[in-house]
Structure formats: C-alpha cells, structure tokens
Amino acid sequence: MMSNTEQLDILYKLKKEVEKSNNARLVHIINQVIKKVYLEQYTATFVGHFSAGKSTLINLLFEENILPSSPVPTTSNTAIVTVTDENGIIANLSNKQYTQLDNYDEVKQMNRENFDVESVEIKYNSPKFNNGFTLQDTPGVDSNVATHQSSTEEFMYTSNVLFYTVDYNHVQSALNFQFMKRLNQANVPVVFVINQIDKHNEDEISFDTFKSRVENSIAEWEINLDRIFYVFKVRTRTQ
C-alpha cells in the first residue's frame, strides 16, 4: 500500500498533466482528493434518491440533528460533516468564495437571497469518531438538475466507501443498479442501504422473499457490494 507521500506525489503529477487539457472540473476533483489525502480524512458518502433518508441516517450515526431532515434547497445541496476539535459551518459559493455561518438556518436564508451555494461544510466535535472522519450527504441521483448530478459524481470519487441509500418502495428501480454498477467500475466500495423497511407488509410478501428478490437483482446486474443493510427506524437487519 502506498504511503500518503507517494499518493500525493502521483496526484500532483496527474494534476499537472490534466491542467494542460483545461479540464477545470477534473482538476477540481483531483484537488479534492489531494486535500483528503493530505488531511488523512476517511470519507463515507451517502448517495441515493431524494427523500431516501440519507440526512436522517447521518444524524443517527452522530446521535445529533446536525443536518435538516428535508433536502436543503441549494444549487448543489452537498453537506460535508467533518469531525474536528471545534464546531463551525462554512458555505462554499459557486464563485470560489466562502462564508462562515452560525447555524444551518443561515444556509436557507442565503438561498432565499439567491446566493449560489455549492456545498456546506460542517465541522463537528464528536466523541464517537476520530478527527478527520467525514460524512458527505449528496443530492438525489434522480435529480434532473445538472449541478446536482455533477456534485454527486464529484464527491463519489473522493470517498473511501459509499452508502447507496434507497427507500423501501424504490429498491427495484433500474437507476439504482445502473449507478451501483458505475461505482463498481470506478472501484468505489459500495454498501447498499434499504431504508424505511418498516413499510414492509409481511401479509403482502414475506421479508425472506423480498430479500431474495433484491439479491437476485444484484446478481443479475453483476454488482459487487460490501454489505446490505435493511434499516427501519433505529434498528437494522444486516447481511
């Protein structure tokens, strides 16, 4: 396994070559990876449909309501929670500027005033996780907004592991399997989270049958998963 110094050396060389092509977006992604390696961050990213419960799951992990439970109406709507010694919130704007905020309500106010917020970085002191541990909450993969899709893909490539999160009623959507297949091709470890399993009705279909259908679909698409979680409220069934 390469050391951080070796990784940074390769990344800087790659960045230098990419800069020759004037591909600003790819350079930006490489810069994000460089930052992650330099700061020795372990990053877990939640992606999935709108209203799949990604923010709620992140709040559950921290045991605090850090993120609003409904989507933040920002242009790219990505929230980055990093464990640090001190708390703070930074809004990153599309013009490469940023501003420090006192609370998340100010993000909503900025959007009402038509500020173009690309992402929100939250520094949070947590006794549960080591400093540098980062959780990212991305826009819905089913969004038709180009900047939402761009934001999701950008943070996808800076992740150590990706939690693909879906609502119980939308498990069999082809979009899910197409996206997870892409993650496999990018060599990003994937955990499949089927949320709101409390919607399951045992009188309509047994849980074992539902589970078998999920596993069969994954096999048909030839998708490799690190794990599957069936989540309902604060308890989980795991595979």
What residue spans do the PLM features occupy?
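Charged, amphipathic alpha-helical linker segments immediately N-terminal to NTP-binding catalytic cores
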Residues: 1-21
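Alpha-helix capping and helix-coil boundary motifs
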Residues: 22-23, 206
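Globular "head" domains of long coiled-coil molecular machines
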Residues: 30, 35-239
